[in-house]
Amino acid sequence: MTAIIDIIGREILDSRGNPTVEVDVHLEDGSFGRAAVPSGASTGAHEAVELRDGGTRYLGKGVERAVDAVNGEIFEAIGGLDAENQIQIDRTMIELDGTPNKSRLGANAILGVSLAVAKAAAEASGLPLYRYVGGPNAHLLPVPMMNIINGGAHADNPIDFQEFMIMPVGAETLKDAVRMGSEVFHTLKKQLAADGHNTNVGDEGGFAPGLASAPAALDFIMKSIEKAGYKPGEDMYVALDCASTEFFKDGKYVLEGEGRTLEPGAMAEYLAELAGKYPIISIEDGMAEDDWDGWKSLTDLVGNKCQLVGDDLFVTNSARLRDGIKMGVANSILVKVNQIGSLSETLDAVETAHKARYTAVMSHRSGETEDSTIADLAVATNCGQIKTGSLARSDRLAKYNQLIRIEEQLGPQAQYAGRSVLRG
């Protein structure tokens, strides 16, 4: 009854107006699942390959080759298989691709099918996706990392670091956390406008003011938290995504906005200094993706009191994560479904992290759609944290709104992660 009878891939547009893959999966019993694949702006060198067409169409960014793979080879390989056998289906597609990074069929093709299959199987079972994937213990609503100031590859301003986020750990519920974040977001907008800064929003809904340094951005955020009626370091904490690989050149960290170049040891000390001065509880990609020694220095400096998240470092890849665990590097993994390219591999990465007492943060990409799958996956994995943008743009709010619905569905079972994400 849950056999796959049809798969339809199509090319749609993401939140940046670039093509991406959407997949529909139909089962024998009439159940249906649909998934759209996200896309990143700052991508790690070790990520699975997002297949693009090249040529002039969509300036080379078309995904017709990936769509053809969905409608052709992939359907031929998994048509007739039971949608409830997720691991078998994912393995079949990975083996069909035959490359270590999914470069032949494209991670965007494989992931679209993988997620749509899970959604169809969830519908067939009569369960919401978070319950189908996570089982009866899926109940933890994640603390949002809300990206309210953008820099780096996400903005046309001098700020070197890519994201400055607020985390409303003092909220009682997810719904309250969203409200608190919204209040700070709108307060920040007023503060920026009053100081003559542009308040247009970037790819992920955050502001991109013409500030020159991380401390300048953090000072604005501190004022906005207080102005909104909350206490920094009590009700609200801060998270950074440095995206350091983007400014790591010839073995050094080139902070153009701040007008200085730092050796890896000095970069680690700078981040430790910021974490000491501001209520920063999470730093993502504080060091570059292949600067393992720098990562070790940073971990030794602040790893006991600050969450150190590997994004480009681990790329949702269990093998790279295991290497990091052995070396005592970082203490958390950012989970992006399209970095690895299948649901089962994503779940394996989260499980690997949790077994090693590393935290996991479910994450969007800068190019998103209205698809809210990652909200369900955050609850399914009980990971306790989600990074899905600011309090603007419907492609970001789709995830927050889905989390509000899930919290409502769970009723008394629902638990907001809140202060449990604090270290030390």
UniProtKB/Swiss-Prot annotation:
Any single GO BP term: glycolytic process
Pathway assigned in UniProt: Carbohydrate degradation; glycolysis; pyruvate from D-glyceraldehyde 3-phosphate: step 4/5
Gene Ontology molecular functions: magnesium ion binding; phosphopyruvate hydratase activity
Family affiliation: Belongs to the enolase family.
Coiled coil: none
One GO cellular component term: cell surface
Catalytic residues of the enzyme: 204 (proton donor), 336 (proton acceptor)
Keywords: Cytoplasm, Glycolysis, Lyase, Magnesium, Metal-binding, Secreted
E.C. code: 4.2.1.11
Transferase is among the record's keywords: no
Cofactor annotation comment: Binds a second Mg(2+) ion via substrate during catalysis.
InterPro entries: Enolase, Enolase-like_C_sf, Enolase-like_N, Enolase_C, Enolase_CS, Enolase_N
Positions bound to Mg(2+): 241, 284, 311
Protein name: Enolase
Pfam families: Enolase_C (PF00113), Enolase_N (PF03952)
Main function: Catalyzes the reversible conversion of 2-phosphoglycerate (2-PG) into phosphoenolpyruvate (PEP). It is essential for the degradation of carbohydrates via glycolysis.
Keyword Secreted set for record: yes
Species this chain originates from: Rhizobium meliloti (strain 1021) (Ensifer meliloti)
